[in-house]
Amino acid sequence: MKIVEVKHPLVKHKLGLMREHDISTKRFRELASEVGSLLTYEATADLATEKVTIEGWNGPVEVEQIKGKKITVVPILRAGLGMMEGVLEHVPSARISVVGIYRNEETLEPVPYFQKLVSNIDERMALVVDPMLATGGSMIATIDLLKNAGCTSIKVLVLVAAPEGIAALEKAHPDVELYTASVDKGLNEHGYIIPGLGDAGDKIFGTK
């Protein structure tokens, strides 16, 4: 599995701000979108382009455009919504597929409860977004759904990832690509990433 920890100074700085314990909901939400945007920049760096001729201000001019690669953004509810706008800044014409999966706090197992995928997902590259890759259960379940629907090109974008989650994802889906702002130390006894970000969903939506 291709694993990319984005080490750009802007990514590290913004992620560091997000780790503040008393960060406001507004600021956390803004930064989640901004880091999501920067991760998208990295994840789409290998998109193929083609040369086309357009009418410029002084006559015909040859330019490069992305070569027919359709994209769907797949936020995992609910926290993934906090990164979605940042992704769409770079790919505004992308279609949106939504997957709802929550983690049982006792068993730590993923529980699917909703999915709405674009009809031609087999023709698209999926950018799956979720702030945290902890145990990997929710991400693996989401990718299972996408593959069952025919999607074969999948990239995962997360703010922070635990080594345990990375290992689980690689074992289940070695063909996907992972882009993260940080590989953190690991999980605590409750299955939360350390140092992590706390509960990203609560911080994005202002709930507890």
UniProtKB/Swiss-Prot annotation:
One Gene Ontology term of the molecular function aspect: GTP binding
CDD domains noted in UniProt: PRTases_typeI
NCBIfam families the UniProt entry points to: PRK00129.1, upp
Gene: upp
Top-level taxon of origin: Bacteria
EC numbers for this chain: 2.4.2.9
Keyword Metal-binding attributed: no
Cofactor(s) needed for function: Mg(2+)
SUPFAM superfamilies: PRTase-like
Binding residues annotated for 5-phospho-alpha-D-ribose 1-diphosphate, in chain numbering: R78, R103, D130, P131, M132, L133, A134, T135, G136, G137, S138, D199
One of the GO biological process terms: uracil salvage
Pfam entry (one): UPRTase
Family named by the database record: Belongs to the UPRTase family.
Cofactor note: Binds 1 Mg(2+) ion per subunit. The magnesium is bound as Mg-PRPP.
Protein name (database record): Uracil phosphoribosyltransferase
InterPro entries recorded: PRibTrfase_dom, PRTase-like, Upp_B, UPRTase/APRTase, Ura_phspho_trans
Entry keywords, A to Z: Allosteric enzyme, Glycosyltransferase, GTP-binding, Magnesium, Nucleotide-binding, Transferase
Regulation of its activity: Allosterically activated by GTP.
Catalytic activity reported: UMP + diphosphate = 5-phospho-alpha-D-ribose 1-diphosphate + uracil
Pathway: Pyrimidine metabolism; UMP biosynthesis via salvage pathway; UMP from uracil: step 1/1
Keyword ATP-binding in record: no
Known role: Catalyzes the conversion of uracil and 5-phospho-alpha-D-ribose 1-diphosphate (PRPP) to UMP and diphosphate.
Residues that hold uracil according to the record: I193, G198, D199, A200
